[in-house]
């Protein structure tokens, strides 16, 4: 057995070394290849079958890098074949860094009466085929956690992922000259039992169809070829998405219970957590208290960064850490909190609050910082059974409530007076607002009128280009007419003034004449009086 294993290892090492040399030589001479090295359909070759693949197809390798596939052959035979198809594969050779070349050929039976098969001394004496099944016992441990099964003096089965002493059924996958690769297979019954055991405890997200039947207080649903009896619970109805867990399973049916109604998938949960964490970071929730005021019990919720002192080894250039120290991350003089842990704590707190809310308990919301004050008030006002403190926490609000009630009774009259003053101020403000609104309304009306006039002028300008010129000429004519009328009026006023002056002169002359007449009358009167 030891000699077989040694021979197998030697053959493997020799084959790999020869293959590397061949590939390297081909890589060196690749630039100097001629048209003779390139194969064509119809070429006749003599190849040696080194392995058998699926469907008993022989595999041979050529020096120019081609892999020849020949059906209906045996491992170890030299065969004369005729090339039928040549194509390049999708894979690449890691040594040559080029595409793998494949050749499909068939055994050439034309032209010669002699046999095309030449059996060598190393040809396979046993008639094994790919796909055959055998029950074997693992005799010895092989390389890479594989098991070795000796079939004859010069032939082995290599079975991966097996242990020494296991009695299993194997199926041949590939045949080489002195060994074959096989994989372990299980019987159908073992597979069914294993599948049933694997099904128990598994969870599935399903939609209960509208056509689902109900038998003995449970829905009947078909899942992966099995009939699953889902117990009715949590108020489930038809066409609901539910999360179920398999409790019992057989080959044809299974029993399951409902865990959740309309569950959230893991991807959606991750997306929701990601969104919440981003919002927390955007609202600066990752900044804690000052580093000096840190409480020792809260250190587990701080974000730490690792600093390691290391060295590189000379042998494999690997980094080996000698000392690792944890230091808290500090920004702006404050500790950076682990937001993931805070999110988990929020989720746990939410569960507890939901339980208390379902029982009808009352809550007190406290948030005295300015950024949180408005949010605390809004959240507290959403429920009728909640109270909040968002300005300043008074000492003894929970422990000494009686004294606080007394101080509240003293403050109430002051608050009433304050409310009256505020009402007066608000009334004055309302009056001022009304006046301002009225003024704004009037200004809007005036502006609308100006807009209408402006639109009318623009329309007239667009209709006639000479509109302004004509209008200006009319204005000039009217202006000239006014000037001429003014001149006439001035002349008339001058004439009137002259006439007035003349009339005044005449009046003065008449007055002077009247005075003289009166002077003449006085001696006449005196004379008459003397006569009488």
From Swiss-Prot:
Pfam families: Ribosomal_S2, TRAM. GO terms for cellular component: chloroplast; mitochondrial small ribosomal subunit. Keywords: Chloroplast, Plastid, Repeat, Ribonucleoprotein, Ribosomal protein. Residues 38-97, 127-186, 197-260 form the TRAM domain. Gene3D superfamilies: Glucose-6-phosphate isomerase like protein, domain 1, Nucleic acid-binding proteins. It comes from the Eukaryota. CDD domains: RPS2 (cd01425). One of its GO terms (molecular function) is structural constituent of ribosome. This is Small ribosomal subunit protein uS2cz. The lineage of its organism: Eukaryota, Viridiplantae, Chlorophyta, core chlorophytes, Chlorophyceae. The gene is rps2-1.
